[in-house]
């Protein structure tokens, strides 16, 4: 077993005996976008909410006009494994728009993904590509922010319903 053991990751048996998969994941990516929609976009029909929020976020510059978000709204898994970690908006003021807030949310999740990729790089296993699945694949701004922040190209899987389907 040549597995690299690191407490920031978790491991599981893989497809053939003696192999394993090292795994990582954020606690609240998609859930956080749904929370934001439900709290701050009640004026929008649900079917239009995410495209409208993405369009508003696209009007905000990179860095969301100085607004930052820590995406730990339900604790965090990789790499800090802290169920008590808390999320927060930093730098919020009266000039910020809903678009700034949503862009900060997207960028905060992307920085969380970057934290994961740096964990693998610390272990001399830097990712060379990211596989994108789930609802976020419909948000071009989210995909681009993740690629820009991590410096890693993404592949959007053909079936993007979610990681639980093994895609």
Predicted features along the sequence, with ranges:
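Active-site core segments that coordinate phosphate-bearing ligands/cofactors
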Residues: 1-166
